[in-house]
Amino acid sequence: MELERFRVGLTPTVFYIPGFITDEEQTQLLNHIYGASGSKWKTLKNRRLQNWGGMVHEKGLVPQELPPWLTKITAEIHESSGLFPSAINHVLINEYHPDQGIMPHQDGPAYFPVVAILSLGSPVVMDFTPHLRLRSGDGYISKDQSPCAESCAPERDSFSVLLMPQSLLIFKDDAYSDFLHGISDSPTQCYNQVVNEAEALAYSNEEDSRKDGDKIFHRDQTRVSLTCRLVPKVRKNLFRF
């Protein structure tokens, strides 16, 4: 796969691959996810999730083998992207109802700085906003203390990506370290500023409309996402180093 042709937006380390899996593969994944034991689900305030691959700790991963159906899809992502130095070993599966989202956040330091998110079910808009600390020189400085120069401002602007079902979003490096990413909890999503406009226009149904010039769609299904990552440090026993 020539990943460069899937790059979107002005931040050079964000890639959006539409139709990464087929309808049949999406159905198979959903069957596996909802066929898992009820105890596998953890319910949070704004979503519920499944954790696969083991427990992530600041000192590394206490591993648990991925099931074959996850090994298969993560191997495809690993081989297609060419961005992970070794096999993906951790997957978080999140389920969102139409009125649920996730606050802007940054993934922890335990992970290799590449994230691959496979989307199933309802489309949604993911927003990226610059971190309060922007990279400058040898370290991080406060955005308030030293605003980004005009020449680099476009790379630090907020942006959004429309995540269609069966698509794969990959972001790394600056997009990983210098931006927060999140999803609005509104069932009505605006896609005026998405960087993959062509894909946004390809999505249509009778519920879509324009309000005061805004391009919007209504989330009417459950969204499921697979967040696939690599934890480089693997600990067979957390208390032995």
From Swiss-Prot:
Ranges for domain Fe2OG dioxygenase: 87-232
Upper taxonomic lineage: Eukaryota, Viridiplantae, Streptophyta, Embryophyta, Tracheophyta
Source organism, top-level taxon: Eukaryota
Gene Ontology biological process terms from the UniProt entry: abscisic acid-activated signaling pathway; negative regulation of developmental vegetative growth; negative regulation of seed germination; positive regulation of developmental vegetative growth; positive regulation of response to water deprivation; response to abscisic acid; response to cold; response to heat
UniProt subcellular location: Nucleus
Disruption phenotype: Faster germination of seeds under cold, salt and abscisic acid (ABA) treatment conditions, but not upon dehydration stress. Reduced survival rate under drought and heat stresses, but increased resistance to salt. Enhanced cotyledon greening after ABA application associated with reduced transcript levels of ABA signaling-related genes (e.g. ABI3 and ABI4).
GO cellular component, one term: nucleus
Binding site for Fe cation: H105, D107, H181
Protein family membership: Belongs to the alkB family.
Binding site for 2-oxoglutarate: R223, R229
One Pfam family matching this protein: 2OG-FeII_Oxy_2
EC annotation from Swiss-Prot or TrEMBL: 1.14.11.-
InterPro entries tied to this protein: AlkB-like (IPR027450), AlkB-like_sf (IPR037151), ALKBH6 (IPR032862), Oxoglu/Fe-dep_dioxygenase_dom (IPR005123)
Protein name: Alkylated DNA repair protein ALKBH6 homolog
Originating organism: Arabidopsis thaliana
